[in-house]
Each structure stands twice: as C-alpha cells, then as structure tokens.
Amino acid sequence: MFKVLLEPDLQEALIFLNESVNALLTIYSECEILYSGRAKSRASLSPRLTIIKPDGSVIIHGPTKREPVNWQPPGSRIEYSIESGVLTVNAERKRPKERLSILHHRVYYITSSEVKPGEFFLVGREKDEVDFIINNPDVIEGGFKPIHREYRTPYGTVDLIGKDKEGNLVVLEFKRAKASLQAVSQLYRYIMYFKEIGENARGILVAPGISENALNLLKRLELEYVNISDKLGDSTISRPINYVPNLQRD
C-alpha cells in the first residue's frame, strides 16, 4: 500500500508525515541540512531526496554519487514540525549525541509506502556456483564426484577438483561472468601442472557464457566448457547448501 502527496503546502505535508507512522517515507524538496554532534556541518538550499525508514534511519541524497549527503542510523528519534515557515524534520540520537535537521522550504512530493522485509539471497558469486556443484555434481556430468575445493598449485588456486566416472582427475575453473581468453589460459596452466605430476587430468571451464575467441582456444587446447546458465536458473544457486562428507579444503 502506498500514498502520494503532490506539491502540498507545508501544513498538508506535516499532517501527511505525522499520519504515516511505521511507513517508508520519501520527500523530494528544496531543503537545507544542518548537523551537529561530533562535528558540525551545513548543506545549503538545494533540491534533494530525503528517505525516512520505519527503524529511524534517515538518508538524504543529492544529484550525484551513491553516498548520501548526510544520514542518521537506525534508532534515531524522528520529529516533524513547522518552524519559521519551514517544514523541519529532526532526527536525533542520544549516544553519541547527534542531531540532523532537514529544513524543507518547498515540498514537491511525499510518498508513504508499506515495505516489508523479504528473504535475501546473494547469488552469482563463484563461491555460490562451486557450492551448488558440490551438492549437485551431475550438473557437470553423470558420475562426477567432487573431492577437493580451493586446491593450491604453483599457478594459483583451483576452484574445485574431482573425479569422473572413469577415475580421471577433473579440474574445474569457475567464472561468474562470461569467460575470456585469460580464463582458458588459467585452466590450461592447471591442467599442465597436474599432467606434469603424473595425473590424467581433464579441464572444464564453468561459466554463464564464453567469448568466441575463448571457445576457439578452449577447443584447440582440448579443454571443455559447461554453460552453468543452461543447467540452472539464478534462483537455483541460492538453495541451501548441504554438507558433503570427505570433501577436502586447504
């Protein structure tokens, strides 16, 4: 559920804010920002976006950059008032004692929204892909058995090694983005290392895509490629990871 108040006068804006308890609020306005606490600062009058969250967080954004112009953390006490013809939002902390005052001279709009927390999954990292393959080895091929992750070699750390159904060593290099020539070369160095120490090794590059040049080099070097996006959706990578007995890790 959400509400929008367009170009209100300051009294209308004050009533709207006071009625929007436990809502996520955004205010687009011409405002000044005053801060006092461990230091003091002032941001001059300018159009800015203020975000007020139900947990007491306050964030004020300008026209550029990811970082806010100023902010207060969760737990701040929020108060609204009209003082000297200006709509004032005060966000105050007791420990440490800090006060952030946002002086809204003209309000262009205010929104009030009900926002509820949902589950959060970070997907797409190489670690997520390795975890998934450990628990779903047939995604690589039938009979594949993972035996060691983050295996150290003189040429770098191999993401995952295992055995195929014929007992051959399988070296897996994971990439979370489209694989390049560099990824193929890295995998080839690993394979050459294992062959030098007497292993009959296969190399498989696991990635959501691969460049044409990288694929051509891969074939010439007799390496293999598994497109992980064809095997599973992004949401699948975020499923819970189970313990795999006897899996070694450096």
Curated annotation (Swiss-Prot):
GO terms for cellular component: cytoplasm. Coiled coil: none annotated. The keyword Nuclease applies. InterPro entries: Endonuclease_NucS (IPR002793), NucS_C (IPR048301), NucS_N (IPR048302), NucS_N_sf (IPR049173), tRNA_endonuc-like_dom_sf (IPR011856). GO terms for molecular function: DNA binding; single-stranded DNA endodeoxyribonuclease activity. It comes from the Archaea. Its main location: cytoplasm. It is found in: Cytoplasm. Keywords: Cytoplasm, DNA-binding, Endonuclease, Hydrolase, Nuclease. Its EC number is 3.1.-.-. Pfam families: NucS_C, NucS_N. The keyword Transcription regulation does not apply. Cleaves both 3' and 5' ssDNA extremities of branched DNA structures. HAMAP family: NucS. Belongs to the NucS endonuclease family. PANTHER family: ENDONUCLEASE NUCS. This is Endonuclease NucS. It comes from Sulfolobus acidocaldarius (strain ATCC 33909 / DSM 639 / JCM 8929 / NBRC 15157 / NCIMB 11770). The lineage of its organism: Archaea, Thermoproteota, Thermoprotei, Sulfolobales, Sulfolobaceae.
